[in-house]
């Protein structure tokens, strides 16, 4: 029974080996045509432009001046605080690196 099992296993492996060899695709040496690349580029560009236009329309439709003013104020306050804390942190790092004199 061991011999039959080995013979069946060898036959299965042989068949699988031939199947794998037959499934290989030939290598294509030709490059994609420039016309195809330009078509893809043009279609992606048109999709991008339409998405930008839709986003701009949505922004204009939902624009609220009060919210815009609050966001600008929040941004200016947060950047001022960040610059202050960045300066403090930089001074601390420099004093640690420099050491005590």
UniProtKB/Swiss-Prot annotation:
One of its GO terms (molecular function) is phospholipase binding. One of its GO terms (biological process) is lipid catabolic process. It is found in: Secreted. Residues 1-22 form the signal peptide. Keywords: Chylomicron, Glycoprotein, HDL, LDL, Lipid degradation, Lipid metabolism, Lipid transport, Secreted, Sialic acid, Signal, Transport, VLDL. Component of chylomicrons, very low-density lipoproteins (VLDL), low-density lipoproteins (LDL), and high-density lipoproteins (HDL) in plasma. Plays an important role in lipoprotein metabolism as an activator of lipoprotein lipase. Both proapolipoprotein C-II and apolipoprotein C-II can activate lipoprotein lipase. Belongs to the apolipoprotein C2 family. Residues 78-101 are annotated as: Lipoprotein lipase cofactor. It holds the Pfam family Apo-CII. Its main location: secreted. GO terms for cellular component: chylomicron; high-density lipoprotein particle; low-density lipoprotein particle; very-low-density lipoprotein particle. PANTHER family: APOLIPOPROTEIN C-II. Proapolipoprotein C-II is synthesized as a sialic acid containing glycoprotein which is subsequently desialylated prior to its proteolytic processing. Proapolipoprotein C-II, the major form found in plasma undergoes proteolytic cleavage of its N-terminal hexapeptide to generate apolipoprotein C-II, which occurs as the minor form in plasma. Residues 66-74 are annotated as: Lipid binding. The keyword Transmembrane does not apply. It comes from Papio anubis (Olive baboon). InterPro entries: Apo-CII (IPR008019), ApoC-II_dom_sf (IPR023121). The keyword Glycoprotein applies. This is Apolipoprotein C-II. Residues 23-28 form a propeptide.
